[in-house]
Amino acid sequence: MEPAAGSSMEPSADWLATAAARGRVEEVRALLEAGALPNAPNSYGRRPIQVMMMGSARVAELLLLHGAEPNCADPATLTRPVHDAAREGFLDTLVVLHRAGARLDVRDAWGRLPVDLAEELGHRDVARYLRAAAGGTRGSNHARIDAAEGPSDIPD
């Protein structure tokens, strides 16, 4: 894969993206504290929040606390980090992204919302959270959610 045109050649951008992708919390923290930019693209044009290990909510928190943009979209697929977290079934990461302002009502290049991906792949807890956060059925192809199954069921 060739580096993206106009991408950052700052080594710390590659280091931060690599640490985020591997879920290395302490390395991500150290790089951010040393001044690595949370939105700087790596040599392939991808931001750390786009390549982070989705199962590491703590990496997401660190990136977001240092100013990472939760709504950055992949230019080819239009997926955002919330699509990735929903597709992989990582509720903790999804909640962190949502609380940081990630939009749940955006479609990818195939017209799918994050809730659609969660439902397609059988991540019921994620789909339940997304439906509740969206106010029930908005954007979803499924029936209304039971009021007792809202975000209050999600651990902090």
From Swiss-Prot:
Effect of residue 48 to L: In CMM2; also found in head and neck tumor; somatic mutation
Record GO terms (molecular function): cyclin-dependent protein serine/threonine kinase inhibitor activity; NF-kappaB binding; protein kinase binding; RNA binding
Result, substituting residue 83 to N: In a lung tumor
Source superkingdom: Eukaryota
Effect of residue 84 to H: In non-small cell lung carcinoma
Cellular compartments per GO CC: cytoplasm; cytosol; nucleolus; nucleus; senescence-associated heterochromatin focus
Alphabetized PROSITE patterns for the sequence: ANK_REP_REGION
UniProt-listed InterPro entries: Ank_Repeat/CDKN_Inhibitor, Ankyrin_rpt-contain_sf
Residues carrying Phosphoserine: 7-8, 140, 152
Effect of residue 88 to D: In a biliary tract tumor
UniProt entry keywords in alphabetical sequence: Acetylation, ANK repeat, Cell cycle, Cytoplasm, Disease variant, Li-Fraumeni syndrome, Nucleus, Phosphoprotein, Repeat, Tumor suppressor
Subcellular location: Cytoplasm; Nucleus
Subunit structure: Heterodimer with CDK4 or CDK6. Predominant p16 complexes contained CDK6. Interacts with CDK4 (both 'T-172'-phosphorylated and non-phosphorylated forms); the interaction inhibits cyclin D-CDK4 kinase activity. Interacts with ISCO2.
Protein task: Acts as a negative regulator of the proliferation of normal cells by interacting strongly with CDK4 and CDK6. This inhibits their ability to interact with cyclins D and to phosphorylate the retinoblastoma protein.
Disease the record associates with this protein: The association between cutaneous and uveal melanomas in some families suggests that mutations in CDKN2A may account for a proportion of uveal melanomas. However, CDKN2A mutations are rarely found in uveal melanoma patients. Melanoma, cutaneous malignant 2: A malignant neoplasm of melanocytes, arising de novo or from a pre-existing benign nevus, which occurs most often in the skin but may also involve other sites.
Name of this chain's protein: Cyclin-dependent kinase inhibitor 2A
Source species: Homo sapiens (Human)
